[in-house]
């Protein structure tokens, strides 16, 4: 059962707990000027045998019992150490966890060889470890990294990572242009004018012995006819040459390789080219006429002239 003491008894008890008057330092103390009644269990009162007076010996005994009840039971140290007589490893989990593949990708490294498991001693030399390569550091041997040193030949399975190389971008080489095997390649960044002269070569679709592309000045002005054998202006810049090349590549299919005339469509260029070759594939279908033309429209016009003559003769008769 629980019983409560009055305010006077609690204040009286506080006189016994004053450290300056009582030699017992470890006894329970009660606050001075306490308005709350002091709650004391009957079991503690019977165990002390002295009413409401608690001395330091009993309180120390209670604290020791509480400590013993809450003490954590740890395994013996001998189970954690290896047994050198039987040469057995300690009873611990020897699995080693390494970062996942995402960590290797964030480190900007790529593995070369698969990882292997090999038992090594704790006092191994630096020759048994590979060299690590990182993107921002120089090659660092494993011996410079902090590691444990032990004189005992402790053998444990340890994963030895393999060599990694950094992912560096490809080196950009200067752009070079070569026209023919007899000429040497010239860097366009250092000699833009010389590169223009080499690039201005006869196109493959043009038969040999004919003219070349029109000049850049004429192409920019939009002229439909240029002089044969024209050469690009040496003082032109690379941007102008690049723009003119883009324009000329579209007009190359419509340009006559003989006179340099630019036609409106490829079919017109084919008809125009027959003038230079002298071919007349379109022959007159009128009976007794041996004329032929290089353009079909001219042949049809000539055929209508035969029909008009015939109609005129029929009308007169």
Swiss-Prot record:
GO terms for cellular component: nucleus. It is found in: Nucleus. Residues 1-22 are annotated as: Disordered. It holds the Pfam family zf-C2H2. Disruption phenotype: Leads to altered expression of 79 genes, including genes related to transcription, genes involving cell rescue and defense, and genes involved in cell cycle and DNA processing. One of its GO terms (molecular function) is zinc ion binding. SUPFAM superfamilies: beta-beta-alpha zinc fingers (SSF57667). InterPro entries: Znf_C2H2_sf (IPR036236), Znf_C2H2_type (IPR013087). SMART domains: ZnF_C2H2. Its main location: nucleus. The keyword Transcription regulation applies. Keywords: Metal-binding, Nucleus, Repeat, Transcription, Transcription regulation, Zinc, Zinc-finger. Residues 1-15 have a biased composition (Low complexity). A zinc finger (C2H2-type) spans 254-276, 282-306. Probable transcription factor involved in the regulation of the transcription of genes involved in cell rescue and defense, as well as cell cycle and DNA processing. This is Zinc finger protein CRM3.
């Amino acid at each position: 059962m629980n019983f409560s003491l009055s305010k006077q008894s609690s204040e009286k008890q506080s006189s016994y707990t004053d450290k300056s008057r009582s030699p017992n330092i470890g006894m329970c103390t009660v606050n001075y000027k306490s308005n709350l009644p002091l709650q004391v269990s009957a079991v503690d009162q019977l165990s002390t045998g002295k009413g409401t007076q608690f001395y330091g010996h009993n309180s120390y005994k209670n604290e020791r019992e509480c400590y013993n009840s809450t003490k954590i039971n740890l395994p013996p140290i001998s189970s954690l150490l290896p047994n050198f007589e039987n040469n057995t490893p300690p009873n611990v989990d020897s699995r080693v966890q390494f970062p996942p593949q995402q960590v290797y990708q964030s480190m900007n490294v790529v593995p070369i060889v698969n990882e292997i498991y090999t038992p090594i001693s704790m006092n191994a030399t630096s020759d048994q470890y590979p060299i690590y390569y990182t993107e921002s550091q120089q090659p660092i041997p494993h011996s410079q990294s902090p590691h444990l040193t032990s004189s005992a030949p402790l053998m444990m399975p340890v994963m030895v990572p393999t060599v990694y190389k950094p992912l560096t971008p490809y080196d950009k080489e200067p752009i070079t242009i070569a026209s023919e095997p007899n000429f040497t390649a010239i860097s366009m960044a250092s000699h833009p004018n010389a590169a223009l002269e080499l690039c201005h070569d006869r196109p493959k679709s043009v038969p040999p012995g004919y003219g070349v592309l029109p000049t850049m000045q004429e192409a920019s002005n939009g002229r439909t006819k240029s002089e044969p054998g024209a050469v690009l202006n040496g003082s032109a810049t690379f941007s102008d040459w690049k723009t003119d090349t883009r324009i000329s590549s579209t007009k190359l299919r419509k340009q006559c390789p003989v006179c340099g005339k630019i036609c409106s469509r490829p079919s017109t260029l084919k008809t125009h080219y027959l003038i230079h070759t002298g071919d007349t594939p379109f022959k007159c279908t009128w009976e007794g006429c041996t004329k032929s033309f290089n353009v079909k429209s001219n042949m049809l016009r000539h055929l209508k002239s035969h029909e008009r003559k015939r109609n005129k003769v029929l009308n007169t008769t």
